[in-house]
Amino acid sequence: MIDRYKHQQLRIGSVSPQQISTWANKILPNGEIVGEVTKPYTFHYKTNKPERDGLFCERIFGPIKSGICACGTYRVIGDKKEDPNFCEQCGVEFVDSRIRRYQMGYIKLACPATHVWYLKRLPSYIANLLDKPLKELEGLVYCDFSFARPVAKKPTFLRLRGLFEYEIQSWKYSIPLFFTTQGFDTFRNREISTGAGAIREQLAGLDLRVIIDYSLVEWKELGEERSTGNEWEDRKIGRRKQFLVRRVELAKHFIRTNIEPEWMVLCLLPVLPPELRPIIQMDGGKLMSSDINELYRRVIYRNNILADLLTTSRSTPGDLVMGQEKLVQEAVDTLLDNGIRSRPVRDGQNKVYKSFSDVIEGKEGRFRETLLGKRVDYSGRSVIVVGPTLPLHRCGLPREIAIELFQTFLIRGLIRQHLASDIVGAKSQIREKEPIVWEILQQVMQGHPVLLNRAPTLHRLGIQAFQPILVEGRAICLHPLVCKGFNADFDGDQMAVHVPLSLEAQTEARLLMFSHMNLLSPAMGDPISVPTQDMLIGLYILTSGNPRGICTNRYNPWNRSNYQNERISDNNWKKKEPFFCNSYDAIGAYRQKRIHLDSPLWLRWRLDQRVIASREVPIEVQYESLGTYHEIYGHYIIVRSVKTEILWMYIRTTVGHISLFREMEEAIQGFCRARWYLS
């Protein structure tokens, strides 16, 4: 629907018969109202033109060719000089043929038909509101049962005679055989009610607010009851309480959306626009038709037969009328959801007909494939790989993708800087990939964010904004901390890239969708940018030390593995673990391949009173000739003078630990500086 502010929106729900009639009916310039489809025909076999009042009627749905009526007369669309703007002979308006994409029709049902989605889908909304078993309602809808109808303050014949002990009774072999069509109609209108009309009467008589009040009272009474000690009874009470909660929620939803319960029973059946259920002529003259057309034909055939029985024939047994009403109900069920009640209806080639539910649901349905999953301009797709050097808000975009996505902006940049005379020259430079093109591309991308999306987009963090930079290769580089929001990993996952074009879209992406602006989960409030998967494995390897376990990382003078520090250049074995005065020397030795990433080493460290004051006994004490001595512990060494004063200390660590500590220290210092600037 389109509101008064011209905002296009879609709302799915039940509508009244009056609303369906308003959508489908249109008044021709001669005052004639058209919109009802009464014939089950599509095209005439001789003229190949749509049948009048059929499923493809041009009077109802509009002309097949713009400005050409069914007679072949041509008029200019929108020309006010030509009057009238429709053909008086065939009744077709001279309008654009695109009207056949949205102009609806309707079928006036001879008897009400229950919407199978509200009856058979679990939980059943109709059974919930009426508080009756689903099997009894199904028997009522499909004319297997009926109930006695009480007339206001007047006893009915059936209740006086006591034929119906309960409200629901079988009538198949007792009542309708004794009445003709006219007599049975009179009898049914006063005494009994059956079919979808009975459901509609009960739904129309509901007061939703009374249902809410009664359900709340019953729920409180059940909550006050103590446990009976019988497990079966306790479960029964629990299920009843859950049912009452669902009933209250459903009634509140109907009140909030201004939907009447009786709208779940159809009196007018909408007919889709013809362009949404086309008939296509293949090579060789063979016609291919949508399954929806055949299902509509079944409904119209059976509905017309029932209408003839009710209006023309006066001697038809009531059983035949009830049987035909059941056939109409089953035809409507098949149209809406084929196979939901029984075995699905098949065509001559034993192929199941695709009903309306099959057309719109699933991955290949109308919404997910055509509306949500359709191809988008200025977008690309590629595999994601880790970008360990990227900031959190940046992503690496392959040159091949970037030059295509930003081609329009790139052409404008080349022309503005007088590097190309026109669009043709700019495209030629882009095609030849001249060096100046990459410089202009970097300038264009510098302030233009891109959107990365990973399907399925189940929550807000499934699509985020990044500042792109050019990278080599054909894969998108991504910071590993943003993977949790996307639920992605680097085992072959793909992501789509979208370029926001308008200034409004770019502003929204920069203010609301940037990855560094979405650090917390919108659902739970927990941190979402936390190390996972690859980062955890990398941190473990970086800080694991000895691969044989954490206990072997302690200094042990009797463990020869403590002295096995291999120098890769000359393959010599050093007898002592190396000592370094600062972290820069240790990292330099690692870059020169003198030590491994997990090789134990001794690093001179600032004095830590918490370590010194501990009561740990040294493993070994080494004395030097000048009187100084070294107290060697499991993870540190204290160097003391002759007077037992502490001169300095060394800690036992690895290059991996040093690298992690430096990164954490820089991050904390940067955070403190940012906090100081803000304060």
Curated annotation (Swiss-Prot):
Mg(2+) binds at D489, D491, D493. It catalyses: RNA(n) + a ribonucleoside 5'-triphosphate = RNA(n+1) + diphosphate. Keywords: Chloroplast, DNA-directed RNA polymerase, Magnesium, Metal-binding, Nucleotidyltransferase, Plastid, Transcription, Transferase, Zinc. GO terms for cellular component: chloroplast; DNA-directed RNA polymerase complex; mitochondrion. Binds 1 Mg(2+) ion per subunit. Binds 1 Zn(2+) ion per subunit. It is an enzyme of class 2 (transferase). InterPro entries: DNA-dir_RpoC_beta_prime (IPR045867), RNA_pol_asu (IPR000722), RNA_pol_N (IPR006592), RNA_pol_Rpb1_1 (IPR007080), RNA_pol_Rpb1_3_sf (IPR042102), RNA_pol_Rpb1_clamp_domain (IPR044893), RNApol_RpoC1 (IPR034678). GO terms for molecular function: DNA binding; DNA-directed RNA polymerase activity; magnesium ion binding; zinc ion binding. Signal peptide: none annotated. Its cofactor is Mg(2+); Zn(2+). One of its GO terms (biological process) is DNA-templated transcription. Its EC number is 2.7.7.6. Zn(2+) binds at C69, C71, C87, C90. The keyword DNA-binding does not apply. It is found in: Plastid, Chloroplast. DNA-dependent RNA polymerase catalyzes the transcription of DNA into RNA using the four ribonucleoside triphosphates as substrates. In plastids the minimal PEP RNA polymerase catalytic core is composed of four subunits: alpha, beta, beta', and beta''. When a (nuclear-encoded) sigma factor is associated with the core the holoenzyme is formed, which can initiate transcription. Belongs to the RNA polymerase beta' chain family. RpoC1 subfamily. This is DNA-directed RNA polymerase subunit beta'. It comes from Oenothera argillicola (Appalachian evening primrose).
